[in-house]
Amino acid sequence: MSENFDSALTYNSYLGIDDLLKLQKPLSDGPEHDEMLFIIIHQTYELWFKQLIHEFKQAQKALESGDTYYSLSLLGRIRTILKVCVAQIDILETMTPLQFNAFRSYLSSSSGFQSAQFRKVEALLGRRDTKMASHLPPNVQDEIAEITKGNSLWDSALIYLTKRGHQMPDEVLKRDKSQAYTQNKEVQDVLLKLHRNDPETSIVCERLVDIDEGLQEWRYRHVKMVERTIGQKIGTGGSSGVGYLSTTLSNPVF
């Protein structure tokens, strides 16, 4: 009986709960009560980033195959995940600046700028500024560089539009994908026409805008949370903190 129980798949064993609950390791003396919340929130973000990467890649396949309904499903899921990411900031904001400062010094050189998965999310969305990965380990830099050589989500959307019968200029479809996409008047004209004449395809385009909006909302809330917590101080890891984060607010994805 004991052997059967030990070998049976359980909630704990399937999800690796025992290992998961050992990953929270506060460094502060005591430790400070609020450090646990800080760790769990950021570990949760990393799990969501992993899921976003998973969903983006599948959404690209769906778009490039011309599958409207599956694309809409996946893009809608991505938008919902981004909403959850925004909502988590509400929890983090229950921590006062004084409570954060009680353990901030223990973070030393660690910083959210070192999130390799978020850099991968940005690359999948079309960011081609690889110097933002220069502070990451060489193998991670290589992984991000590899992503930037392929299609971004927007490139996949352009392929989807051709599958739907909307002609795209060759210089856009065959461009060097390692370079950032630049606005193209012919593409803009096509988008304007399809919104008038192809409502089904226009819904897919609206889902992409929803994702852009979701990411911008997350960035805005992140900036305001950091501003509220540390003001204009230098961020952990030596980053410029609010100063840099504010510059990202004017960078739309699409």
Regions found by a protein language model. Give the residues of each.
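Surface-exposed peri-terminal alpha-helical interaction modules
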Residues: 1-254
